[in-house]
């Protein structure tokens, strides 16, 4: 644990790449006294949204847009999303102003791929978030990963974060499974702690815990227990 290390010289801590689980952030704070400052960016950009020094970090928030980018959250119709509404994170490009520093201009030998992300005077990240009344952003997930069930848009990360709070859960992945009438239903793939045996009662416990800690329609209708969850080479 952290108690075995001298962290007295540690002044700041930041994270990016994957959404930060709030439970992990709180455990880190208790162990070190530091708040992790989460941010958001892509290979195609520099950091776009961040909890900069001076911000009061809000649990689960990736912060506010950095000054160099005109970040806009757009709904499916291309309009600005209202506070609390999920939208795509984009960078507005004003032809009358200098091109945004740090934003790439094109994919190498990828004309069609470039056109897919640059249109309607915006660079489209393909990532979704929502914003609170004070302008703080909260990451939801990739547009392709958002689950559409019975007219609801469900972000996988929120459900994963809740299930990971259960003491007997090691890992969790949330995906959408095709459904004849609902379009998709939520599926939870779960890795349990050693010694914990899968059971129907455990499935019900996980489902009820999600219902109690999120909106009831977000609970996983399918729960599968596995020994491990496959990851890409960069750990995602």
Predicted feature locations:
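Conserved ATP/PPi-binding loop(s) of AMP-dependent carboxylate-activating enzymes
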Residues: 65-68, 79-116, 154
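Active-site glycine-centered loops adjacent to acidic/histidine catalytic or metal-binding residues
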Residues: 17, 41, 63, 127, ...
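Short, P/G- and charge-enriched loop/turn segments at secondary-structure junctions
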Residues: 55-61, 116-117
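Gly/Ser/Thr-rich phosphate-binding loop
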Residues: 2-58, 70, 77
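Glycine-centered tight turns that cap/initiate beta-strands
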Residues: 9, 33, 68, 168-171, ...
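Hydrophobic alpha-helical segments, especially N-terminal targeting/anchoring helices
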Residues: 74-75, 83, 125, 131, ...
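Beta-strand->loop->alpha-helix junctions that form or flank phosphate-binding loops
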Residues: 37-44, 48, 63-65, 175-178, ...
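AMP-binding/adenylate-forming catalytic core of the ANL superfamily
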Residues: 95, 113, 128-218, 235
